[in-house]
Amino acid sequence: MSDLDNSNLQKTLASMLKEATAIESSDLYGKVIVQSSDRWRVILCAQGLQWIIQKKESSHAGPWRAEKYLTSRSALIKACGTLGLLSDPATEVVLFALPEHVSQLAKK
């Protein structure tokens, strides 16, 4: 493979990776707040307007699907508790460390 072909391949791969990290349903999404298990995680939406509780499709190769959309920490913690996602102490610590409202993230 020539240097030019290799350079183009690297650029293409970098572009694909950047795109994958911007897609909320991707395993590579870059704004994951906490992953409480193999099948559940909390992310910050791409626009930074809300937290989303996502569940991995039953096929482990499947995408992440949104289950709940929340803007307040208290509602997020309550929803996670209802779904049984607070059994991991590390998840609890991360969620309680979030600001009371998602809009406060932009102010930090």
Question: Residue spans of the language-model regions?
Answer:
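Short beta-strand segments and strand-loop junctions that repeat across beta-rich extracellular domains
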Residues: 46-66
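Negatively charged, low-complexity tracts enriched in Asp/Glu with abundant Ser/Thr
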Residues: 1-40
